[in-house]
Curated annotation (Swiss-Prot):
Places the protein is found: Nucleus
Pfam family membership, one: DNA_ligase_A_N
Sample GO molecular function, one term: DNA ligase (ATP) activity
Family indicated by similarity: Belongs to the ATP-dependent DNA ligase family.
Residues the record lists as binding ATP: 324, 326-327, 331, 394, 436, 496, 501, 518, 520
PANTHER family, A to Z: DNA LIGASE 4 (PTHR45997:SF1)
Organism: Phaeosphaeria nodorum (strain SN15 / ATCC MYA-4574 / FGSC 10173) (Glume blotch fungus)
Gene assigned in the entry: LIG4
Residue ranges constituting the BRCT domain according to the UniProt record: 728-821, 900-989
Protein name: DNA ligase 4
Catalytic activity: ATP + (deoxyribonucleotide)n-3'-hydroxyl + 5'-phospho-(deoxyribonucleotide)m = (deoxyribonucleotide)n+m + AMP + diphosphate
List of residues binding Mg(2+) 1: 394
Length: 990
């Protein structure tokens, strides 16, 4: 006899109706969805049983090692923090299953509210909630408590406790509510009732209606419960556990399903039984269901192009890889279904990488009211046989007037403008969807197929609609030497970099692996000029920087010639916001010069002398917390990576990655940069960039690649060399001309004069300029400006000096044999190699770098070759740099931590006879290693970013590489003390 199925009690039925209504559509969509058997627990159990224990575990961390502690029911555990957190979550979920039922969705959407796509955004940020609470508690908006909430980033003025909550809005609200709470004990409002009220709150727009919902909460909650409710509304939980942990504990396949659907409700309702696993097509993505796309991995810090290509898993049968330009836009997926009832016959869906629905902007239909900024123009984009399709790509902004991509910051503005374009005008800026993958076609899931097959499907199903929807082009490459020319091209065009792809790879949802690799130029030429700009606004920090200005709004003067009384006197346009590179002394100096002169920014009455972004639309983008008259302010000297367009600032341009250099105490406010002066600087910098090639390094150590003369010189076996062997004074170079541009650096140093003498002694002719004569050998071992200029021309190979030595030595070894010129080896002999010669010269050595024509006499070189023959160990190891880059990619950068502050540096230390300086240098080296940097003793090593010199060694600084900054140990110490990377020029040689 089968067991009786337990039926939901009356309270459970009431709560189910309260949260989901009598929704037949839900039952049809989720026919097997679970229903709880009993009432959900009180809201406060979320923080008493889950949030607080998790945060307490976070604070404690792992217990220090010591005597073995007692284990068992009455002893202490020695679990790691991660294990302890999992235990807490497992207990909470097990308790829910036992006492409530299998529908965990009501709790899950409160635990990870930022992943809940079913509930609309509340439209409530900190200040809006503060205004609601002021009305709720019926306190004066001019009272101290009201000001504490409205100015939550400011240090507390009411009592000492307020100072500790500067930057913590929910904590500040607790202080205000705790003295006015209707309930001192924990309330009885259930999780289901809270969800019902939050659903209503998300549908309301007016402040008065929002106050009524908050009154309902306040009547049944105490101050602590209200504090957690506010965190849920703001979607700022910070409880010490990620959504991945919760999903993994809920069900083994929960993360997989979330990756293909981005639907928390579906995860909870379809995977309520841990014993029932996803199978087959259930693990694949679906039409009109947002999925988590595949991501590109970050290149290894210090990895060469050769190593990057090796990670793309090329093999002897297929050594190809694809090179694509990395686009500066927003990752977007397009879903299309044929629908006879939709205007135009097709239904569209657009989702960002963060699962935000953009169909309202880019369009749901081809025609009618819901034809958006893109769909109205792509009627002919799909083949006649395409019934449905899912495309993966990048939404970018394209400027039709210059026919070029525009920075990401302009995308939404361009889309809104294009939405109103009814005539298909070919001017201005517009959204352009660049498609690089097809993951679903005509009811067929394509993710298991190779990228090459998916590309064929894409090209057969989609046709370009010029500057609306285009298939993103790629270059098929076969050697790592093809990467640098492509990278140089995109750098010259101010692009973001490259993406390298393995055409043999399948599509992996929500995975960042080596099948797609980003390659970015880390050390590009900076904007080139320091900018002295006036400070007009200040922003209060949060967390440990709460209560004081942590960043500043800088502006450009409109008219430096204006006099007091003129309309333009002191008038400024906002330009950029800077918060990096300040030390405690810098903050103190700025505070000392401006204290008492700051005014709170009133959005209803903004100062007329300061215009912000959005001014013409009566908006206030990047609004500061406080402002200051330019005549009372200070001038900051700042540098940046580049200038880019942005409607967030009044000037419509801003600095990318600005950093503070120094406080210009020698400049008056009216000597700060004006709008016209900046235009002149910008034009000058752009002119210089056209004249001089951008210098860059690839992450930590870009591999120098070698090339030789376009016209082949005499090679092994040539009958033109008939002179018999004559020892060191041979005629091996007879008939060749040598243009030696630099000294030799590797494997030993030789001066330019010594090299020229060696060439002459062996029959060669020395010239002092390049030409197109067929037997000219150009020699260099350093990338000087004249060498870089020759590379840019791309007409001649450039040979390393070691080839001269190798050729002479080989002919000494072959005493008595017919003398011959040693064939070029790409890695050892070539400094710059023309693409046309690549395959020919690669044939001169095997895969491990062992030459077919040259004897290996050097032990270290032999050891290196033998080491390369060892098969790589198949192992999975933690990639720290990739992990940190992913955190930054998700907006959770660790750049404020000391263990990350030097992560992008490689530092060379000079030696000194001064024992005191040597000790300081050792300590500085330890700081750099702890901060994630690399240490080297060779200043000429690839990728060196900083050179630390002893005090007084300024005379020899000229030999430091162009891209290496010269500093003293004082810079390292100061960065360490301030927990931030400071500007190098302030701490040179000390």
């Amino acid at each position: 006899m089968a067991e009786d199925t337990e039926m939901p009690d009356a309270e459970a039925v009431r709560e189910n109706t309260l949260m989901y209504g009598h929704d037949d559509e839900l039952d049809e969509k989720f026919p097997t969805r679970p229903m709880n058997l009993h009432k959900s627990p009180p809201f406060h159990t979320l923080f008493t049983d889950l949030f607080d224990p998790l945060m307490e575990t976070q604070k404690k961390g792992r217990q220090p090692p010591g005597p073995r502690r007692k284990a068992g029911p009455h002893g202490h555990s020695n679990l790691s923090p991660h294990e302890a957190k999992r235990n807490i979550i497992e207990r909470f979920i097990a308790s829910w299953r036992k006492t409530v039922g299998n529908d965990f969705y009501p709790a899950m959407r409160l635990i990870i509210p930022d992943k809940d796509r079913d509930r609309a955004m509340y439209g409530l940020k900190e200040k809006a909630i503060a205004k609601v609470l002021i009305k709720l508690t019926k306190i004066s908006k001019d009272s101290d408590d009201a000001k504490q909430m409205l100015n939550w980033k400011l240090p507390g003025q009411l009592h000492k406790a307020s100072a500790s909550t500067a930057g913590d809005f929910a904590g500040r609200c607790y202080q205000v509510l705790s003295s006015r709470q209707l309930n001192t004990k924990l309330g009885d409002m259930s999780i289901a009732e809270v969800n019902n009220a939050l659903d209503k709150l998300s549908q309301l727009g007016s402040e008065d209606e929002q106050v009524k919902i908050f009154q309902r909460f306040n009547r049944r909650m105490n101050a602590e419960e209200m504090t957690w409710l506010i965190r849920i509304i703001l979607r700022q939980m910070k409880i010490g556990a990620t959504e991945k942990t919760f999903l993994d504990i809920w069900h083994p396949d929960a993360e997989t399903l979330f990756n293909i659907s981005s639907n928390l409700r579906r995860v909870c309702w379809e995977l309520y039984d841990p014993k029932v696993r996803l199978e087959g097509e259930d693990t694949g993505l679906s039409l009109m269901q947002c999925f988590q796309p595949q991501l590109a991995a970050f290149q290894d810090k210090g990895g060469s192009f050769e190593k990057i290509v090796a990670r793309l898993q090329a093999n002897s049968d297929d050594d190809s890889f694809w090179i694509e330009e990395k686009l500066d836009g927003e990752r977007m997926q397009l879903h299309m279904i044929e629908d006879p009832e939709a205007p135009g016959g097709k239904l569209f869906g657009f989702w960002s990488r963060k699962a935000k629905d953009y169909a309202y902007l880019y369009g749901k239909h081809l025609q009618g009211d819901e034809a958006g900024a893109l769909t109205r123009f792509i009627t002919d984009a799909f083949g006649k046989n395409v019934r449905n399709i899912i495309l993966d790509g990048e939404m970018i902004t394209w400027d039709m007037d210059v026919d070029h991509i525009v920075g990401f910051g302009t995308l939404k503005t361009a889309a809104i403008s294009e939405k109103e374009n009814k005539t298909d005008k070919s001017t201005g800026q517009r959204p352009l969807f660049r498609v690089f993958d097809c993951v679903y076609l005509n009811d067929k899931l394509l993710t298991p197929y190779t990228l090459r097959d998916r590309r064929r499907a894409l090209e057969s199903a989609v046709k370009d609609v010029k500057r609306r929807l285009e298939i993103h082009p790629y270059i098929e490459a076969h050697s790592h030497t093809e990467i640098e020319p492509a990278l140089r091209k995109v750098v010259a065009e101010s692009s973001e970099g490259l993406v390298l792809k393995n055409p043999r790879s399948m599509y992996r949802l929500n995975d960042r692996n080596a099948d797609w690799m980003k390659v970015k130029p880390e050390y590009m030429s900076e904007f080139g000029e320091s900018l002295d700009c006036i400070v007009v606004g200040g922003y209060f920090g949060s967390g440990h920087r709460g209560g004081a200005h942590s960043s500043f709004l800088c502006a450009l003067l409109l008219n430096k010639d204006a006099k007091p009384g003129d309309a333009d006197y002191e008038k400024c346009w906002s330009f950029f916001k800077v918060g990096g590179g300040f030390s405690r002394e810098d903050y103190a100096a700025i505070r000392g010069r401006t204290e008492g002169k700051w005014k709170d920014w009133d959005p209803r009455r903004p100062p007329p002398i300061i215009e912000l972004g959005g001014h013409e639309q009566n908006r206030q983008h990047e609004r500061p917390d406080q402002w200051i008259h330019p005549s009372d302010s200070v001038v900051l000297e700042c540098k940046a990576a580049s200038v880019e367009g942005s409607d967030k600032f009044r000037f419509n341009l801003t600095l990318r990655f600005p950093r503070f250099r120094m406080l210009r105490t020698d400049k008056r406010w009216d000597q700060a940069l004006s709008r016209e002066e900046f235009y002149e600087i910008k034009a000058n910098v752009e002119y210089k960039r056209e004249e001089k090639e951008k210098e860059f390094e690839i992450e930590k150590s870009r591999r120098k690649r070698t090339r030789t003369t376009k016209k082949p010189i005499v090679v092994a076996g040539s009958e033109t060399i008939t002179t018999p062997y004559a020892g060191p004074q041979s005629k091996i170079f007879d008939g060749l001309s040598f243009y030696i541009m630099t000294e030799q650096l590797h494997p030993t140093k030789k001066s330019k004069v010594d090299l020229e003498a060696l060439v002459k002694a062996n029959g060669g002719r020395v010239v002092q300029r390049d030409s197109m004569e067929p037997n000219l050998v150009i020699v260099a071992d350093k990338r000087l400006i004249k060498v870089a200029s020759l590379e840019k021309r791309d007409t001649n190979n450039i040979v390393k000096p070691v080839w001269i030595q190798d050729t002479i030595q080989q002919n000494e070894v072959d005493n008595g044999a017919l003398p011959y010129l040693l064939p070029f080896e790409p890695n050892r002999h070539m400094f710059y190699l023309l693409g046309d010669n690549q395959l020919d010269y690669e044939a001169n050595a095997d895969d491990y770098g062992d030459s077919y024509a040259r004897d290996i006499a050097d032990v270290e070189e032999m050891r290196k070759i033998l080491g390369a023959t060892d098969p790589p160990q198949k192992r999975t190891k933690f990639d720290r740099e990739s992990f940190l880059d992913q955190l930054e990619d998700h907006g959770d950068s660790l750049s404020h931590l000391k263990t990350y502050m030097f992560s992008s540096t490689k530092v060379a230390f000079r030696t000194s006879d001064d024992p005191v300086w040597t000790l300081r240098a050792q300590l500085a080296g330890n700081y750099i290693r702890f901060g994630g940097g690399q240490i080297t003793e060779d200043e000429d090593e690839e990728g060196v970013t900083h050179t630390v010199v002893p005090d007084g060694q300024t005379a020899s600084v000229s030999r430091v590489a162009d891209l290496s900054r010269v500093v003293g140990v004082g810079w390292v110490q100061k960065c360490w003390d301030e927990s931030t990377r400071l500007d190098e020029e302030r701490y040179q040689w000390g």
